[in-house]
Design a protein with these regions (language model features):
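Short, small-residue-biased leader/transition segments that mark boundaries at the very start
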Residues: 1-2
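Short small-residue beta-strand/loop micro-motif enriched in glycine and branched aliphatics
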Residues: 106-111, 172, 197
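C-terminal domain-tail junction helix/linker
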Residues: 197-263
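Mobile genetic element proteins and their domesticated derivatives, centered on retroelements
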Residues: 7, 22, 85, 106, ...
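RNase H-like two-metal-ion nuclease catalytic core shared by retroviral integrases
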Residues: 146-148, 153-161, 170-193, 202-214
Length: 263
């Protein structure tokens, strides 16, 4: 199941009316599809997200607050800005996702973690550094904005490679202000179309995680003028990223964002 925008953008030359007209027909019952079948015709209430971190020790935030993030990107306008977060599975289970989102093209990266810990996040950073090389990592991930979660508080292990080279700059949102990285928070909706809240990730593998990711990145968006994050990222990011991580475009008519995708 794809969004109405994705379907319209993929078949605009075959549809002899506007999207507004199609909505009107659906309202009047002309088609079998109903309003409830359309994602954006159903009101989505975003959950409030509480940080799991203890902020008693704020040393990890020194020189890396949201205010300082804004100052840095204002002075360095050409840098890629990446938002980072984790997505939890069912309560009482360990596996979760580490997600990263490129603001300039809406491309998301997603990695399966065995547990929501600093050690696991650092493992992914080290893996990406080895896979891409330090120079490409520095180019793509110069600035990362995340929340105050316990899994992100060992800033040094994230900012420095195993060889002691600076690979990124980590900045932190203000406490309880997940909206400051709202683009990624909103993009998590696509994960929940396939893995609804409360679903365990224990049966997920790196392979099924990549499959889900490629479907998400292949869905066309209004915010990208009817293009998909994958399409735009091929123009704006170094394509060595796509090759190294196995990012691939799913044909428009095959994009599927329902639970059956990985069952």
């Amino acid at each position: 199941c794809s969004s109405d925008l994705h379907i319209y953008a993929s078949h605009a030359d075959e549809i002899a009316c506007s999207r507004r007209t199609i909505y009107s027909y659906i309202d009047r019952g002309v088609f079998q599809a109903r309003n409830i079948d359309l994602r954006r015709k159903v009101v989505y209430k975003q959950r409030k997200r509480k940080t799991t971190a203890s902020l008693k020790d704020r040393s990890f935030r020194k020189d890396r607050s949201y205010k300082e993030f804004l100052e840095y990107i204002a002075a360095n306008k050409s840098v890629y800005v990446v938002e980072m977060d984790t997505v939890e599975g069912a309560k009482g289970t360990s596996p979760c996702f580490l997600t990263m989102f490129f603001r300039n093209c809406s491309l998301m990266l997603m990695f399966l973690l065995e547990e929501q810990t600093q050690k696991e996040v650092t493992r992914i950073f080290d893996h990406l550094t080895e896979l891409l090389g330090i120079e490409l990592f520095q180019k793509l991930f110069e600035v990362i904005l995340t929340d105050n979660g316990h899994e992100f508080q060992d800033r040094q292990s994230l900012e420095y490679s195993k060889n002691g080279e600076v690979r990124t700059r980590i900045y932190y949102c203000d406490p309880n202000r997940s909206d400051q990285k709202g683009a990624l928070e909103k993009n998590h909706e696509y994960i929940r179309y396939v893995l609804p809240k409360g679903t365990s990730f224990e049966k997920m593998t790196d392979k099924t995680t990549l499959l889900l990711l490629n479907h998400i990145n292949s869905e066309k968006r209004d915010s990208l003028n009817g293009h998909s994050p994958y399409e735009v990222s091929r123009l704006l990011l170094d394509n060595r990223l796509h090759k190294a991580l196995g990012l691939a475009e799913i044909p428009a008519d095959e994009v599927t964002l329902i639970p059956a995708l990985i069952k």
